[in-house]
Amino acid sequence: PVAPIDEQQRIADFLDAKCAAIDALVADIQSQIDTLEQYKRSVITETVTKGLNPDAEMKDSGVQWIGDTPAHWGVIRGKYILRYMQKPVRENDGVITCFRDGEVTLRSNRREDGFTMSDKEIGYQGIDVGDLVVHGMDGFAGAIGISDSRGKASPVLNVLDTDQCKRYIMYY
């Protein structure tokens, strides 16, 4: 349908105003989301390095970026509390991916396209529900989590076991 030119102009003016208002709301909400994500990161960092008791006696951790930690806590390298696991791949398992938001799940749970499949799954390993998984290249960016799925993964994912609380390690 084609409206008269003056009505087209009014429609365009109306839509310009409405879309600008919606865009402003989206920008404001995105700013709030960014602020909340930053706050979430600070709460996690503060809690895993300082604990839950703000009145606890503190000591120097010996690690510059951590600073002081509760006096009754120890500082130990990850290699002493984490063990690499190598599990066999099961036939017909789907591919698991460790995403930067910390989700470790079957790739098909997140998307259907936009990734490549490997013809030869050399070095692939099995992953079970509850496994602690760290992405070998994106772990620093948050690609660490606990698997919610059973499947297989490329060698870039590290499956780890620990006697510590896996959820705590995931946040750390």
Which sequence ranges carry the predicted segments?
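Extended intrinsically disordered, low-complexity coil regions enriched in Ser, Thr, Gly, Ala
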Residues: 48-56
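Short, tandemly repeated low-complexity microdomains enriched for cysteine and small residues
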Residues: 37, 56-60
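Amphipathic alpha-helical segments
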Residues: 1-37, 70-76
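Non-catalytic DNA-recognition/assembly elements of restriction-modification systems
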Residues: 5, 9, 60-90
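Heptad-repeat alpha-helical coiled-coil segments used for dimerization/oligomerization
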Residues: 37-43
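DNA target-recognition domains and sequence-specific DNA-contacting regions of bacterial/archaeal
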Residues: 1-2, 76-172
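Residue-level signal for well-ordered alpha-helical scaffold segments within enzymatic catalytic domains
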Residues: 13, 24, 46, 68, ...
